[in-house]
Amino acid sequence: HEGDFDGAVSQATGTARVDDPYAYTGTWSHRWTDADGDGYAEQLQLVWKADGTPISSIDPELVGELAFNSLWSSASNAAALGGNVLSRLNVFRLADKHARDLWGMGLGDFARQRSRGGADGYDYSGGGYSVGADSGFGHDNGIWGIAFGQLYGHAKSRGFQGRNTQDTRMGSLYWGRLMEESRRARWTFKGSLTWAETRNNMTSRLSGAPASTGKWNNETWLAQAEVSRTADYAGGWRLTPFLRVEFTHGRQDAFREQGGYGRDFGGAALKRLSIPVGLEIGRTDEWKGRPWAQSLRVSYVGDVLRDVPEATVYSPYSDMGWRGRAVSPERHGFRAEYNTSLQCNERWSVYGGYSLEARGNSLYHRVNAGVARSF
């Protein structure tokens, strides 16, 4: 009844006035009307009077960087396999040209990417496995190998309530060849081509709304080539300066979210050409009479070409579209890699490795451990 209602207030502002850059501006009011014509105003109507001012900014919760950041973690998954198969092609493996190796390893891939340039960052954690085989094909052909793997992980938004579960399946072809320069020096050439497909399942929770979910696929290609020169020194030490080229190309499907304030995401792409250049220090000792090889390589990594993923995002609920973009990591970074292997007997060996890459205040980690059998 009239007099029982004081007025309408917005849940967003706590007053009748709505003045927010992320929403349409205006004022709420109310009135009582005589709906049945009996002369008594018994129906309450809420009235919205818009100012006609358009929305000037997109609510940061709606922008959707987590979806586009998925291409970064897909690329990292591909590098977890592609980089590890190259690390297997060390001087000792390439010198054993006629051996056939079957191997398996566990993989770990982790990223702590801070928000940067107004774009939301992410934290990624993933684990999985890979298996492979390689064999020598004569003195002039080097060693060829093939590998398959799978990584399962999830990425979390740094600033909002979003989580993306990722399942990546990968395959890699790799090759390496050793060329003797002298009794104490040799050149190594190696490369790999890795393909990965990632299935994404993202859940977003926007303030005041039920959760929305979106599913889509990413496809990633990674091509790597490396040249290095190893020289032997006194005390069993080896020094290996190296130059590597890494080209990554990723593609993300368009998709539509379901539930909540579901959004429409356009397809996006990632391109990056990186050149790591550095030095590897290694030596081989004995542990309980068994050969034990260790190496540490450090390098500067620079991106000479890069297209950060971006695409159009549309919200049917607000009838608005905008350009969404992934976070842009620093172009320059430092990478450190440690690898070790122990020859258990004539047939069996175990190995492991750890890689750390720092770009500004963001960190990327990869670990691996496995076993190989020679035939």
Q: Predicted segment positions?
A:
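Extracellular/periplasm-exposed beta-strand and loop segments of Gram-negative cell-envelope proteins
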Residues: 112-114, 120-122, 153-166, 197-221, ...
